Amino acid sequence: MGYTKLNLKDGNIVDEKVFQHIDNNFSQLYDTVGDYSIHISFDDTVACLTNLTKNTYTSLFDEPFFGWLKGLHDMYGAKFSLYVYNLTTLSSVPTTYKSEFFEARHWLKFGLHSKQSGFNYSSETYANAKKDWNSLASGIIKITGTHQSIDRIPRLHNFSASLEAATGMRDAPCGVLGFLAADDSRVSYHLTEAQNAILKAQSQYLDKENGLIILRTNYRGEWLNSADGMYEMMESFLSDSSYVNCFKPFVWFTHEPYVYSASNGLTDKAKVVEDVCKFAYDYHIPFTYPQNELNIKP
């Protein structure tokens, strides 16, 4: 067996299932990630989805978190990934906002973080992980009307997944192309210590044997001691030679509860996200999704 034909649209692989079988030709299919770009994502995403379930809005963007994201998109061209922390919450979201989600598909995508709070995939089976990804994908398509709203290189809880879980998610319809790894020295997902060392040094590891690309997370918003200074921090990375591989793309994230709660709205920490967006805009660094930066060869 080999690969199904790859059809691309807006940088997204649109086949129902990309890999029929992973073989030694993987290196001919993928090259490296490209020029400078930035990816912004939110782990533990649940509050904004809960609001869509519990409240009725005239527009999707009347929900405060989604409205804030749209404001950043409109002002800076920012794009975001929301990594879902509870599949039950996702399945409860109504289809009321499908047309707006569909229109936002090029700048707002969803991926899996965990099927429920506190759960990681370090010991999960192939079948169960594949089932969870199926639930994630079908839930996203239900509320957005398109598979183009799926982020296929997500960040799983604790940066953890057994090889069985990783390949189960890979083999699901609209399955993963890879994962976003840890922002520290811990070993991520199914990698060995040696593979993780390559990842840390190069900010990416191409797992040819299993058909997965692993990208290092470069910064988390919570590292900053205050809400001020994120812009200057990002500027410093441009002149730091140790970050030479890190803008291909620069993988920046925070957690939804750090910047937003369903009951209290946006926190003062939302400024760190706003500063990253302004920095990228000012320095002409495009916003992207890692899946769109893969150089997929014909």
Residue ranges and their predicted role:
Residues 7-10, 15, 25-26, 92, ...:
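Active-site-adjacent pocket scaffolds in enzyme catalytic domains
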Residues 30, 53-57, 121-128, 153-158, ...:
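Conserved aromatic-histidine-acidic binding/catalytic patches
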Residues 34-37, 75-81, 105-109, 146-152, ...:
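Loop/turn elements at helix/coil->beta-strand transitions in domains of secreted/extracellular proteins
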Residues 79-164, 185-186, 248-252, 256-259:
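Metal-dependent polysaccharide deacetylase catalytic core of the NodB/CE4 family, i.e.
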Residues 176-182, 250-298:
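C-terminal domain-boundary segment and adjacent tail
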